[in-house]
Amino acid sequence: MTESVLDYMTRLGRAAREASRVIGRASTAQKNRALQAAADALDAARAELTAANELDLAAGRASGLEPALLDRLALTPARIDGMITGLRQVASLPDPVGAIRDMSYRPSGIQVGKMRTPLGVIGIIYESRPNVTIDAASLCLKSGNATILRGGSEAIHSNRAIATCIQRGLAEAGLPAAVVQVVETTDREAVGALISMPEFVDVIVPRGGRGLIERISRDARVPVIKHLDGICHIYVSQHADLDKAWNVAFNAKTYRYGICGAMETLLVDQQVAERFLPEMARRFVEKGVELRGCERTQAIISAKPATEADWHTEYLDAILSIRVVDGLNQAIEHINHYGSHHTDSIISEHQGEARQFMAEVDSASVMLNTPTCFADGFEYGLGAEIGISTDKLHARGPVGLEGLTCEKYVVIGDGQLRGQGSC
């Protein structure tokens, strides 16, 4: 009899829970060996990876997948290099598991501190980007967690090929294959099952469009680490170095349109708008970026009218909304009202203004004179990131190794008894 999706996912969950106990006590050397061996396997399987990815790209083009999504799906030689480098970098990172901090003596004579431990089993649900398979697997493995990966159907061939390489690395290190499992079925029922197994799964990390993440947040029976949108802003202040501002804003938008850290709205102080916008617009138009602006913007440059919906939109495309604001306070008000609490940056040479922006903008990352596309685990020194959280509980911002662990209290005594002594 054919196995049902629920039975299949239950089998994966049970295997992951058992594997989590093995990887949770694995040594740092053993985990690093698995990561290095997986990197070697990827390097040796470039032709297979490219062939599998081409199957996904061909299917995506045939189904009318948008250019930005096709870009996310593509495994170019440079991106394969990046995955290999990413595995080796994660192997070189300090292992957070078992680290003890804040040990102190209490009046009773006991010592109290905190120890980092794995979360257990992490379910990752993502769309389009096959490199997420490597990012997620490497971070979960190094942090001592088992993981169940459910990629989008559009990347099924790529994900299977990548998973094969990871399995080779695990085997070489003597670790069970169930430490990293890829959901083989494209049936959407698998997602519902994965987010409804608290007995097997400790946390879910969704990476994808708003619809996916809203559904996961609404229906999950286990905790979720997430962000809904990447509506990122750059504010060019009256104290900005305009040469710096032109370069930073251009990079923030055009580095890669399809990433959540791409700038979607450019805010410009009215004091510099007439000097800043014409050259900025020239660069964007030359690059093929469609500009949508407020009335004050349209009085200075050629741009389509920006609607209320534009300020709420994560384009993930070559489209940029521009607003001229009265000053710093209005810029902060705009960001906190329309933004997604992801990443926002100010271009300014005024330290007091920069401090106010960083203190009052309610986002996971706030930046000074920096493109928003730097919101990335590698750039922050975390290694690969599992995702970016805009929530305020457990983890906020790019989630790396430490964000995939939790703390438990460690108490050391020498036979002390409660109710005796100074307490």
From Swiss-Prot:
Keyword Coiled coil present in the record's keywords: the answer is no
Gene3D superfamilies in alphabetical order: Aldehyde Dehydrogenase, Chain A, domain 1 (3.40.605.10), Aldehyde Dehydrogenase, Chain A, domain 2 (3.40.309.10)
Question: In the record, which residues are listed under signal peptide?
Answer: none
Transferase as UniProt keyword: no
Enzyme class per UniProt: oxidoreductase
Task: Give the catalytic activity.
Answer: L-glutamate 5-semialdehyde + phosphate + NADP(+) = L-glutamyl 5-phosphate + NADPH + H(+)
Q: Which UniProt keywords apply?
A: Amino-acid biosynthesis, Cytoplasm, NADP, Oxidoreductase, Proline biosynthesis
The catalytic activity of this protein is classed by the Enzyme Commission as 1.2.1.41
> What's one GO BP annotation on this UniProt entry?
L-proline biosynthetic process
Q: What pathway does the annotation place this protein in?
A: Amino-acid biosynthesis; L-proline biosynthesis; L-glutamate 5-semialdehyde from L-glutamate: step 2/2
Name one molecular function that GO assigns to this entry: glutamate-5-semialdehyde dehydrogenase activity
Intracellular or extracellular location(s): Cytoplasm
Family per record: Belongs to the gamma-glutamyl phosphate reductase family.
What does it do? Catalyzes the NADPH-dependent reduction of L-glutamate 5-phosphate into L-glutamate 5-semialdehyde and phosphate. The product spontaneously undergoes cyclization to form 1-pyrroline-5-carboxylate.
This protein's name: Gamma-glutamyl phosphate reductase
**Organism encoding this protein:** Pseudomonas putida (strain ATCC 47054 / DSM 6125 / CFBP 8728 / NCIMB 11950 / KT2440)
